[in-house]
A protein has these predicted regions:
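C-terminal helical subdomain
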Residues: 186-187, 193-194, 201, 205-248
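Canonical Rossmann dinucleotide-binding motif of NAD(H)/NADP(H)-dependent dehydrogenases/reductases
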Residues: 2-36
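Catalytic loop of short-chain dehydrogenase/reductase
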Residues: 13, 17, 95-97, 102-116, ...
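Conserved glycine-rich Rossmann-like NAD(P)H-binding loop of the short-chain dehydrogenase/reductase
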Residues: 31-47
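The beta1-alpha1 cofactor-binding region of Rossmann-like NAD(H)/NADP(H)-dependent oxidoreductases
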Residues: 42, 62-77
């Protein structure tokens, strides 16, 4: 049954209670959005959707594997049966790098393919699959969640975990952001990339004490997701402040 909720937002990679995706979903749900949690583990996504519903918010969960084009298309079809428009798309799903690879000379090719499939190709594919619904919204917003790693191309910063494959994938995601923004320049759709900063979403891994909470990190993503008609497009931001374009 189509939703009667006026604003709809889909967040990919939203299946962990301490993850950025769920924090963004809660923020948007509290701003009167019907939030769609899309994740490979739909059971976990449904648990989180139920947690939101128990708080009086509107939420649903769908299965999504960005490495599987059939899964992307299936989500598009199923979502079209529930809603007639999509106001916000948060491309949050991300494959994590192998941090043991510190040089472009020893990158594992399987890991590289996984990183690009999720962080770039899957994001692109999902955006195109949902574009018809995005065009039906009065002024849709697309937010690509990037990383400080995109600004580390070719650098070896002391004390910073460095993965050339991950940096290159996020750098490419930033380039995709600019490309999509240009392609949609004649529409009311705004496309931006947001770096949420270092997020304490994996306490079991010993996150740094200075990492931001998921809720704190989500604020900048929500800012980009709720920009007004005169908002920027094709830019890079953190906490609503512009970041310089990554350079080679």
């Amino acid at each position: 049954m189509p939703t009667t909720h006026s604003r709809v937002a889909l967040i990919s990679g939203a299946s962990r209670p301490l993850g950025l995706g769920f924090a963004v979903a809660r923020h948007l749900a509290e701003r009167d959005h019907h939030v769609i949690l899309a994740a490979r583990n739909v059971a976990q996504g449904e648990e989180l959707a139920e947690a939101l519903r128990s708080d009086g918010l509107v939420a649903s969960a769908f299965a999504l594997d960005l490495a599987d084009q059939a899964s992307v298309q299936r989500l598009s079809v199923e979502l079209s049966g529930m809603v007639d428009h999509l106001d916000v798309l948060i491309n949050n799903a991300s494959a994590m790098p192998d941090f043991t690879s510190r040089s472009a000379l020893d990158v594992d090719m399987d890991s590289l393919h996984t990183l690009f499939q999720t962080n770039v190709f899957g994001c692109w594919s999902l955006t195109l699959a949902l574009l018809p619904l995005l065009r039906q919204a009065p002024a849709a917003r697309i937010v690509n969640v990037t990383s400080a790693a995109a600004w580390q191309i070719g650098k070896r910063t002391p004390g910073l975990l460095f993965s050339p494959a991950y940096s290159l994938a996020k750098f490419t995601l930033n380039a995709l952001t600019v490309t999509l923004a240009a392609a949609l320049a004649d529409s009311p759709i705004l496309v931006n990339a947001v770096d949420p900063g270092s997020v304490a979403s994996h306490p079991e891994r010993g996150d740094d004490k200075d990492d931001r909470s998921p809720s704190e990190a989500a604020a900048g993503v929500v800012w980009a997701a709720t920009l007004g008609a005169d908002g920027p497009t094709g830019g890079f931001f953190q906490d609503g402040a512009p970041l310089p374009a990554p350079t080679l």
